[in-house]
Amino acid sequence: MHAGEAVQQLKKAFETVASFDFRDALSKASTPVTVVATNGPFGLAGLTCSAVCSVCDRPPTVLLCINRKSYAAGIIKSNGVLSVNWLAAGQAVISQTFAGVGSVPMEERFADKGWQTIATGAPYRMDAAVSFDCTIANIVDVGSHSVIFAEVVARNHAEECTPLIYHRRQYATTRSLAE
């Protein structure tokens, strides 16, 4: 077997890992629970997003990955602004609502007074562990998802809170090892 055949066999082996095995492996990694929201000329929308992380602090930038087929994806990209809200321990219902559980209409998802705006007009959750108000800096499409790079223009955070995380396909919280 020559090197080209070996590379092709490796590629094929990795392709078989894809969908189910990939998602199953990632379910064992804990992730913060976030809701991404937008409002602007193209409408009001939001979704629960598990793929969010920091990129750099100069300029302060985060990235998030959203399925291009989701209702909110096109609205978020068209508005050009968004908020990223890392939820606190008692906010699993908010996560479920924005994930589509219960088929709550989009406008009703934002009906309670916990949603406000800072700079861009994108709604942020006042009682979230952390909320960033952002403008979209870049979008890269990869497979089924859009990777959105968003520059942070304002922030809000709770003084004391326990974050909500998702681990092994269920909600959980963190606990300090020093206790």
Swiss-Prot record:
<keyword id="KW-0560">Oxidoreductase</keyword>
<dbReference type="Pfam" id="PF01613">
    <property type="entry name" value="Flavin_Reduct"/>
</dbReference>
<keyword id="KW-0547">Nucleotide-binding</keyword>
<keyword id="KW-0058">Aromatic hydrocarbons catabolism</keyword>
<protein>
    <recommendedName>
        <fullName>NADH:FAD oxidoreductase</fullName>
        <ecNumber>1.5.1.37</ecNumber>
    </recommendedName>
</protein>
<feature type="binding site">
    <location>
        <begin position="65"/>
        <end position="71"/>
    </location>
    <ligand>
        <name>FAD</name>
    </ligand>
</feature>
<dbReference type="InterPro" id="IPR012349">
    <property type="entry name" value="Split_barrel_FMN-bd"/>
</dbReference>
<feature type="binding site">
    <location>
        <position position="144"/>
    </location>
    <ligand>
        <name>FAD</name>
    </ligand>
</feature>
<keyword id="KW-0285">Flavoprotein</keyword>
<dbReference type="InterPro" id="IPR050268">
    <property type="entry name" value="NADH-dep_flavin_reductase"/>
</dbReference>
<dbReference type="InterPro" id="IPR002563">
    <property type="entry name" value="Flavin_Rdtase-like_dom"/>
</dbReference>
<feature type="binding site">
    <location>
        <position position="166"/>
    </location>
    <ligand>
        <name>FAD</name>
    </ligand>
</feature>
<comment type="subunit">
    <text>Homodimer. The chlorophenol-4-monooxygenase is composed of an oxygenase component TftD and a reductase component TftC.</text>
</comment>
<comment type="pathway">
    <text>Xenobiotic degradation.</text>
</comment>
<feature type="binding site">
    <location>
        <position position="99"/>
    </location>
    <ligand>
        <name>FAD</name>
    </ligand>
</feature>
<feature type="binding site">
    <location>
        <begin position="104"/>
        <end position="109"/>
    </location>
    <ligand>
        <name>FAD</name>
    </ligand>
</feature>
<dbReference type="GO" id="GO:0042602">
    <property type="term" value="F:riboflavin reductase (NADPH) activity"/>
</dbReference>
<dbReference type="GO" id="GO:0016646">
    <property type="term" value="F:oxidoreductase activity, acting on the CH-NH group of donors, NAD or NADP as acceptor"/>
</dbReference>
<keyword id="KW-0520">NAD</keyword>
<feature type="binding site">
    <location>
        <begin position="48"/>
        <end position="51"/>
    </location>
    <ligand>
        <name>FAD</name>
    </ligand>
</feature>
<dbReference type="GO" id="GO:0042803">
    <property type="term" value="F:protein homodimerization activity"/>
</dbReference>
<keyword id="KW-0503">Monooxygenase</keyword>
<comment type="similarity">
    <text>Belongs to the non-flavoprotein flavin reductase family.</text>
</comment>
<dbReference type="GO" id="GO:0010181">
    <property type="term" value="F:FMN binding"/>
</dbReference>
<comment type="function">
    <text>Reductase component of a two-component system that degrades 2,4,5-trichlorophenol. TftC provides the FADH(2) required by TftD. TftD oxidizes 2,4,5-trichlorophenol (2,4,5-TCP) to 2,5-dichloro-p-benzoquinone, which is chemically reduced to 2,5-dichloro-p-hydroquinone (2,5-DiCHQ). Then, TftD oxidizes the latter to 5-chloro-2-hydroxy-p-benzoquinone.</text>
</comment>
<feature type="binding site">
    <location>
        <begin position="54"/>
        <end position="57"/>
    </location>
    <ligand>
        <name>NAD(+)</name>
    </ligand>
</feature>
<dbReference type="GO" id="GO:0004497">
    <property type="term" value="F:monooxygenase activity"/>
</dbReference>
<keyword id="KW-0274">FAD</keyword>
<feature type="binding site">
    <location>
        <position position="145"/>
    </location>
    <ligand>
        <name>NAD(+)</name>
    </ligand>
</feature>
<feature type="binding site">
    <location>
        <begin position="166"/>
        <end position="169"/>
    </location>
    <ligand>
        <name>NAD(+)</name>
    </ligand>
</feature>
<dbReference type="GO" id="GO:0006208">
    <property type="term" value="P:pyrimidine nucleobase catabolic process"/>
</dbReference>
